[in-house]
From Swiss-Prot:
Organism: Synechocystis sp. (strain ATCC 27184 / PCC 6803 / Kazusa)
PROSITE patterns: SPASE_I_1 (PS00501), SPASE_I_2 (PS00760), SPASE_I_3 (PS00761)
UniProt KW keywords: Cell membrane, Hydrolase, Membrane, Protease, Transmembrane, Transmembrane helix
Topological domain spans for side Cytoplasmic: 1-16
Name of the featured protein: Probable signal peptidase I-1
Catalytic activity as recorded in UniProt: Cleavage of hydrophobic, N-terminal signal or leader sequences from secreted and periplasmic proteins
InterPro entries found in the cross-reference section: LexA/Signal_pep-like_sf (IPR036286), Pept_S26A_signal_pept_1 (IPR000223), Pept_S26A_signal_pept_1_CS (IPR019758), Pept_S26A_signal_pept_1_Lys-AS (IPR019757), Pept_S26A_signal_pept_1_Ser-AS (IPR019756), Peptidase_S26 (IPR019533)
The keyword Membrane is annotated on this UniProt entry: yes
Top EC class for this record: hydrolase
Residue intervals on the Periplasmic side: 36-196
Family: Belongs to the peptidase S26 family.
GO CC annotation, single: plasma membrane
GO biological process, one term: signal peptide processing
Residue intervals passing through the bilayer: 17-35
């Protein structure tokens, strides 16, 4: 029995160039059109997302339906932030609070949507600012960070054009101790307590 020589790494690559090219093209297509990894650089989404978390952001679903209230989205900065020096290629991550046609107001530490107070169990602390009622225009959304008092979001720079949305943050893959699906939060209006 005769042993065939072990091919060198260069010979292996040369023989498998077509396969490697197909794999590279598929990887690039997945990254640009289907899903991509993202790194969380700030604390604006505490306690939901921590600085250093790594997420999978899917890019397909919003081509078929608009974002929903409660979705955590990744997006390019709106025009006002670009004027202030943020690069168009930079990415932000926030939670969708209101959709086109809905109103948003912040008063005495409570966020209201369409006049109803929201019960937001996922926020770090109640907002320490007020925002007069504003109606979200067509083609835009209102977004806020879960760390209400440390977030550069719609309460500062206004509405986010839906065309700026990169995708929906679905899954945290790092760190392993916080591994899992992010999902969307279903907003429940706060109960009104009537003293009798």
């Amino acid at each position: 029995m005769q042993n065939s020589p072990i091919p060198s790494p260069w010979q292996f690559i040369k023989e498998n160039i077509p396969l490697l090219m197909v794999a590279l093209v598929l990887a690039l297509l997945l990254r640009f059109f289907v899903a991509e990894p993202r790194y969380i650089p700030s604390d604006s989404m505490l306690p939901t997302l921590e600085q250093g978390d790594r997420l999978v952001v899917e890019k397909v679903s919003y081509h078929f339906h608009p974002p929903q209230v409660g979705d955590i989205i990744v997006f390019h900065p709106p025009e006002l932030l670009q004027v202030q020096g943020y690069d168009l290629g930079q990415a932000f991550i926030k939670r969708v609070i209101a959709l086109p046609g809905q109103t948003v107001e912040v008063n005495n530490g409570i966020v209201y949507r369409d006049g109803q107070p929201l019960q937001e169990e996922y926020i770090l602390e109640p907002p320490q600012y007020n925002l007069p009622a504003v109606r979200v225009p067509d083609g835009q959304v209102f977004v806020m960070g879960d760390n209400r008092n440390n977030s550069n979001d719609s309460h500062v720079w206004g509405f986010l054009p839906q065309q700026n949305i990169i995708g929906h943050a679905l899954f945290r893959f790092f760190p392993a101790s916080r591994w899992g699906q992010l999902g969307s939060f279903t907003f429940v209006p706060a109960r009104t307590i009537i003293n009798t």
